[in-house]
Amino acid sequence: MRIKWKNGLSIEYKGNRVVFDAQSRILNCKVSFVTHAHTDHSYSFRLNHIPVISSEETMRLISIEGAKTRKWQPLTVNEKVKIGDLEVIPHPSGHILGSYEFEVCTPHGVVLFTGDLNTREGRIVKPAEPIRCDVLIIEATYGSPEFIFPSDREVGDEMIRWAYKVLGENKIPVFQADAIGNSQEIIRIFNENTNMPVISHWRVSKVNKVYEHYGHKIKYIDINSGEASEVISSANTVIVSPKKLDLPSNHRFVSAIVSGWALKFRGAAFPLSDHADFPSLLNFIRDCSPKIVLTYHGGAFNEILAKYIEKKMGIKSYPANLTPITFPI
């Protein structure tokens, strides 16, 4: 079995090659698997020359932006896909609606590719499942010891307190977050703990509708509705919008960033994250009991996490992009 990182994860066994979260056009490959709908993982939905496999939820979320491969195939949790002697099995990754980690089984060993990972119990998505494996390929977005998140309950309480403070100044709080994932969590925080109406940007509203289709109750008002205009005039609401979106040029709106990176920000920012923090990554690795750990998707943190794993956990580890590996070694 040969494992290689080059614009996505490639696993090859006896001439059958599959790719996970491809980031560019791929050749000589049987199938491309997509872990979830965020754009930095879902390039494969632009491809039409090979089958592209994901959850149905992922396909629906990606379709919001108009991207849809003609060769998409659905895959449900624990359903097995055979490609020669490779067997691929999806499990929940805990990140966003429909997100998967992929277990790849061969006669010579088991690989687990996490995609984006969250091991905490969310308000909407089930947490990631540790799977015993020989080779673990794990994301390192927050793969450095300084990233220790407070509990989601603590963060939610802080967000509510901040929102009431802003409203008390006769201004409107705006939470800026990823349109898929964190935005729905924010809306649920206010739905479950306040009577405050929540207005969502139209891009967030499109995502909300997909979540609702799969049975997740989210109460919101679309920003383009007449009702939203009335509620904004009353100054008793919060707004949820995508990150990096310019607000109207008046002083009535006060924005806060919602992201794990908030631990590094000054000003109004809240570390609500759909990724695992550093201790959670280590716990997940321990529970998977791998012989080798490859780190990815963390930039400089790939090496920081890999060195920590080797030194503190005694497991061979290095960044996935450094060199291909053949397993068994």
Model regions: which residues?
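His/Asp/Glu-rich metal-coordinating catalytic cores
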Residues: M1-L27, V31-F33, A37-V174, G181, ...
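C-terminal regulatory/interaction regions
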Residues: N7, G215, D222-I329
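Short internal beta-strands
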Residues: I50-R60, I137, M196-V207, V293-H297
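Short hydrophobic/aromatic-enriched beta-strand-loop microsegments
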Residues: V52-E56, R70-T76, T194-W202, M313-L322
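Short, aromatic/basic amphipathic alpha-helical patches
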Residues: I64-T69, I189-F190, V210-H216, E303-G314
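Gly/Ser/Thr-rich loops at beta-strand to alpha-helix junctions
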Residues: H95-L97, Q176-E185, H297-E303
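Short, surface-exposed basic-aromatic patches at helix termini and helix-loop junctions that form
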Residues: C105, E129, R188-M196, Y308-I315
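Hard-cation-handling environments
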Residues: D157-S234
